[in-house]
A protein has these predicted regions:
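C-terminal transmembrane-bundle signature of multipass membrane proteins
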Residues: 195-258
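Internal transmembrane alpha-helix with an interfacial aromatic "cap," most often the third helix
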Residues: 40, 65-78, 88-122, 130-135
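Non-cytosolic membrane-interface motifs at loop->transmembrane helix junctions
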Residues: 76-88, 229-234
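Membrane-interfacial loop-to-transmembrane alpha-helix junctions, especially the N-terminal start
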Residues: 47-56, 115-119, 201-211, 230-231
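Hydrophobic transmembrane alpha-helical segments in integral membrane proteins
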Residues: 15-36
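Hydrophobic alpha-helical transmembrane segments of multi-pass membrane proteins
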Residues: 54-69, 215-216
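Hydrophobic cores of alpha-helical transmembrane segments in multi-pass inner/ER membrane proteins
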Residues: 29-38, 90-105, 186-195, 234-248
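Membrane-proximal helix-loop-helix units in multi-pass membrane proteins
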Residues: 102-189
């Protein structure tokens, strides 16, 4: 009976893994691409601010990269695998610009042009810091083994129930990662997407992003290299905010464009 119980437990775990695999697959990513494309079309035709539908399109591209990535997952020596991994990191690096553009579009009050220019400048600085992590500079050392996206090679691989990425990043700014006892491995990114929106009043959106971005990713997997890919579920939230006037106005407190 003990043997039968062990077999039953094993079968249960396998079924659970299969369910997760079915939920997170190339098919699911393709469906997200279709949903994102439809959302871009709808918001553009409705005359929404460009920042909204362009950001939707930007995150739809990430879902496309993930969908294509499934075709070469775990093939670390495959140039296509390496290229998709690099493109995925570049997408993450440029996210501060698009996230702030979106957040300013749904801020409680219109953001003055002078302030928007400074926001984009600071977001671009964060992007520059992210890109600098790719440069193999001996003076900056290597990224910390076990930290998000850190690896000895560039590869897209199978995670616990989604995909993950690793790259041979350098150790730039990792000295700030343990400030206040909290490990934040990409501090410039976090400041740009979570703190910067507070400056122009988009604190609700920043909190929303925090909950469905890193908190959701950390809750769903303990694999630090898989968490960024799951974080891209954030695109679902962007779609909801973009398409639902109730969520945008009542929940996010967005201003009404003139």
């Amino acid at each position: 009976s003990e043997t039968l119980a062990n077999v039953s437990n094993l079968e249960a775990r396998l079924i659970e893994q299969e369910v997760f695999a079915m939920c997170w697959s190339a098919t699911a990513s393709v469906a997200m691409v279709a949903l994102g494309g439809a959302a871009v079309a709808v918001t553009a035709m409705r005359g929404e601010p460009k920042a909204i539908w362009i950001t939707l399109g930007f995150f739809t591209v990430m879902e496309g990269l993930q969908a294509v990535g499934y075709a070469v997952v775990d093939e670390c020596s495959n140039p296509a695998n390496q290229s998709i991994t690099l493109l995925s990191y570049l997408h993450i690096a440029f996210q501060p610009l698009f996230i702030n553009a979106f957040a300013m579009a749904i801020a409680p009050s219109p953001v003055p042009k002078w302030q928007a220019r400074r926001v984009y400048g600071l977001a671009a600085l964060a992007t520059g810091f992210m890109l600098l992590k790719l440069v193999p500079l001996q003076a900056l050392g290597n990224c910390t083994p076990g930290s998000p996206l850190c690896g000895l090679q560039t590869c897209l691989f199978s995670g616990d129930w989604h995909i993950g990425w690793i790259l041979p990043l350098n150790g730039f700014m990792e000295g700030f990662s343990s400030t206040f006892g909290i490990h934040i491995w990409f501090p410039a990114y976090f400041l740009a997407v979570f703190a910067l929106p507070l400056w122009y009043g988009a604190w609700r959106f920043a909190l929303f992003h925090l909950l469905i971005g890193p908190f959701l990713a950390f809750a769903l997997t303990t694999n630090p290299n898989e968490q960024p890919a799951i974080w891209c579920l954030f695109s679902i939230g962007i779609i909801l905010v973009s398409l639902s006037s109730f969520i945008r106005v009542r929940v996010m407190g967005a201003h009404q464009p003139a």
